[in-house]
Amino acid sequence: MPGKEVVILGSGDIGLIMARRMTLEGAKVKVVAELMPYSGGLKRNIVQCLDDFGIPLKLSHTVVDIDGRDRVKGVTLAQVDENRKPIPGTEEYIPCDTLLLSCGLIPENELSTGMGVTLNPVTGGPIVNESLETNLPGVFACGNVLHVHDLVDYVSEEAARAGEKAAAYVRRVHAGNAPGAVTDAAGAASAEEKMIPLKGENGVRYTVPAFLRPAYMDEQQTVRFRVGAVYRNASVAVYLDEKQIMKRKRPVLAPGEMEQIVLKRSDIPEDVSRITIRIE
């Protein structure tokens, strides 16, 4: 154990789980501070890791000073404004001997970038189509290298799908019928085959996949996405160009919880130029 009195900065799932683990190991977790006005973790982890142990969560707060030379003696928290800047006069000193930083995950893609895979600036992972194929033909991505997941169940599903589609690609290569690249270097659709951009708007930060090729879609296509803020009593709407084909009510949408919808291949006509997912 690095210490006995702990302050945690960051309320994603790892930070929340570490708060519980350090408490169970005998430490006193004094507070979990979060820069954003919402937690980045699953609701159940907030309840099971913080609420059940009486650990306070301070939203819209960050560490502005660390006291100590040879080791930490305390930290100063401050509330932040809508621009994430500390608000003068809101400082609070908290004695502690350990500061645990849990400030976000990004996919590790050194191998991908070295190969020339195009990355999504929002997720930090590759841009993929419905088969989880990148802009490099025959190169597929799944799991946390693609985008950070909440649940290992989703990682397992993506891994199975990527393996299935990679095997199908190899069979097409041997048959002399391999498709062209998913996207060009700029992320644009290849002219060799029909590709439909899939985009998020009005609160949807990104979608996986980012492109759909009707010729290679299964009848049911899972699309995963995250929102950029907390929404209550909102709806997830799907548009083909400007025509709405789906609307699903959600009591709560939060950045810390990955969302998903299922599109049907039979609902997508050949003349569609784009698909959009919006929060309404």
Which residues are covered by each model-predicted region?
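Aromatic sugar-binding surface patches on proteins
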Residues: P255-V262
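Short, aromatic- and glycine-rich surface loops/edge beta-strands on solvent-exposed regions
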Residues: V223, V236-V238, L263-E280
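FAD-site-proximal beta/loop scaffold in flavoenzymes
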Residues: D97-H149
